[in-house]
Amino acid sequence: MADDSLLLNFSLGDNNIIQPETKLKGGTWRDRLSAKKIAKHHAKGPRTAGDEDSAPRAPRNPNRIEVPSSRPTKRQRTDGGDSGKQQSHGHPHSNQPRQFISSLFTKNPEPQKAEEVKEEGHVENAKPTNAPLIDGLDTFTNLGLSPNLAAHLLTKLELKAPTAIQKASISQLLKEEGDAFIQAETGSGKTLAYLLPLVQRIMALSKPGAQTDATGQPIVHRDSGLFAIVLAPTRELCKQISVVLENLLRCAHWIVAGTVIGGEKKKSEKARLRKGLNILVATPGRLADHLDNTQALDVSNVRWLVLDEGDRLMELGFEEEIQGIVKKLDARQRPSRIPGIPARRTTILCSATLKMSVQKLGEISLKDAVHIKADPEDEDEKARRSKAEESAYRVPAQLKQSYAVVAAKLRLVTLTAFFKRTFMRKGSVMKAIIFVSCADSVDFHFEVFTRKQVKEDGGEPSDTDKSEEKPPSSPHGTIAPATAFSNPSNPVTLFRLHGSLPQNVRTSTLGAFAKNKEASVLICTDVASRGLDLPNVDLVVEYDPAFSAEDHLHRIGRTARVGRDGRALIFLQPGCEENYVEVLKRGYRDGGKALTRADANEILKRGFGGNVESGNKDWETKATDWQCEVERWALENPEYLEMARRAFQSHIRAYATHIAAERSMFNIKELHLGHLAKAFALRDRPSKINVPGLRQGKEETKKDFKAERNSAAGKKRKAGGADLADDIPSANNTATAAQKMRAKMKEHMAGANEFNLA
């Protein structure tokens, strides 16, 4: 052809040169497509300088794919105009772990249900439903108790009149010898309701006079045998029953009581059993063990068996143990030579609720039992109700209960602000209990509230401040001053309690909290929610909602006991948890009119010193500073950071264990894990905390797969082309390495410019 040797030389501008398309490798086709679009976007011409609205935005690149820059144009710029402003579109710090510090007061979900916020002072005081009777005729003597025991109750225990359930049960159990089921609300005195008839009957067996031996001593003494057994679900409840029983038996010193519970040495328990006991308080597991392995335990004379907290006994899985205990007591029962002792055994079942599990326990242990309630006049009305309504729990009428809808990020600061306000004035509240869901959360919050505080000026506490904040002696680390919400005029002591602590530590901590005369707070799990009668508890805070409505009843039942006033507050999160308010209302006789709502912002304002009436936002700054200080404290101490992560993980696992009927209100899929992590002073992404039991999302699974694939491909390339890596010299620091890399790139670019046309 004639035109084969034709050469054309066109003069084109820099902007008209068609640059070769950059080929992207690695990743999925979706990622390559998005990276290709990003490259085309940057290949467009620059925007006008005066167009502020068209300022380029940072491209969204969640997978952080490095987009290679385009090849240089025909000639390099030598004027140095805007070359220094060009920045790499990659992420230079992508290999370093990123921490995100989110604001406390932004992007928080709003409550779905807007209700009127009532002040607690506007709530009418209700008549106590579990208080002692004020009628002068209803005394312990009129119920059938001996004058000696009634006088002991009046003078030593300062009990002037019985409660409604005590009046109904004492008269019934002293009059008849049949089985009984005692049902009453929490804090109404059920322990004395069955202990007083028990002690009265054993005292009648040993009454001086005709029933004495040759020396004039009562026939019944510690060697006479075991007459009564009291079973309780927890060790703490057994200890409390034992203390009440010992106080009662001070008027009958010849009757001996003892305990056998888990966590103590069996050798010492066997020694006590060999010496002889008349009344035994035990946990089901340890009693079943002694019945099988201890020959000194003689149960042939046992005529009274009490099952306290029957619903909890079934929830903890003691059905088989109790069934075995009842069978062994029936098989080993023998006629007694002691005059006046009943021919058959009397079984008493106590429970605040009447659930199917309690009914099943009654079928195992009770025979023709009488149902004892505090309000017998309402029996006909209750009989017409359905079974679900029969088993509904009731809250003491004098208990002032409220709830606060708090966003996940604000939970920790709101709890701190609430107790700052609570203990601002000395004497307003003496004792309070905080219930959380798991033991790891107890340990973390205990360390947060007892850590060394940083002054507002940023300095460390002085020696005088340290001397004023000396904690009480606690060799086990369960007692410390609550520096987070103490003040110079009202120091507060913090106690911690959970089931993972050794038994001796749990007993000593609980005893120290009960005996403390100053302001104190107990942070604990549900191990302290059942049956414990802790004196002067004015406030109960459910920081984590209970796993069932019955557990909620027992939690708030630690206050407002035996006619005393009490307050309770529960924390709920916006969303599906707000439906739990209807469950709370069902526990009231008036349909929940006494249930009030507390505003979370008002709690923060009052706690962090802001003026509620004005629009000043100083309280937000103080709350944010306090939260950031806790987060820095956790980051600076690896031990506490690991403790926070464990608490977060355990909290998520515990959140998924709500009962099936309430799981729609506590849906783990609707939890914002990132916001919730901030309540544990964590700045890590939840995906990096590795929460066991949670499935990874699609994006996280895809990232993990690509990371493994890229690492494997990198190893292959490194094995096959190790000599290429030697072209880039190594450096000791990042700055030197970057400088040498730029020099290497200039060499490659200089070689490419030699082949430019024109």
UniProtKB/Swiss-Prot annotation:
* E.C. code: 3.6.4.13
> Where do the Helicase C-terminal domain residues begin and end?
398-620
What the entry says about domains is: The Q motif is unique to and characteristic of the DEAD box family of RNA helicases and controls ATP binding and hydrolysis.
Q: Which gene encodes it?
A: dbp7
Describe the family membership recorded for this protein in Swiss-Prot or TrEMBL: Belongs to the DEAD box helicase family. DDX31/DBP7 subfamily.
Q: Can you supply a Gene Ontology BP term from the record?
A: endonucleolytic cleavage in ITS1 upstream of 5.8S rRNA from tricistronic rRNA transcript (SSU-rRNA, 5.8S rRNA, LSU-rRNA)
User: Source species, please?
Assistant: Aspergillus fumigatus (strain ATCC MYA-4609 / CBS 101355 / FGSC A1100 / Af293)
Query: Which cellular component appears as one GO term in the record?
Result: nucleus
Protein name, please? ATP-dependent RNA helicase dbp7
Organism taxonomic ancestry: Eukaryota, Fungi, Dikarya, Ascomycota, Pezizomycotina
Q: Which superkingdom does the taxonomy of this entry point to?
A: Eukaryota
Q: Which residues form the signal peptide?
A: none
Q: Which positions in this protein are listed as binding ATP?
A: A184, E185, T186, G187, S188, G189, K190, T191
- Compartmental location: Nucleus, Nucleolus
> Biased-composition ranges for Polar residues?
84-98
For this UniProt record, the keywords arranged alphabetically read as follows:
ATP-binding, Helicase, Hydrolase, Nucleotide-binding, Nucleus, Ribosome biogenesis, RNA-binding, rRNA processing
What are the Basic and acidic residues biased-composition ranges? 110-125, 455-471, 697-709
- Region Disordered, as annotated, extends over 28-98, 110-130, 455-483, 697-745
Domain Helicase ATP-binding: start-end pairs: 171-372
Please note every region of biased composition (Basic residues). 35-45
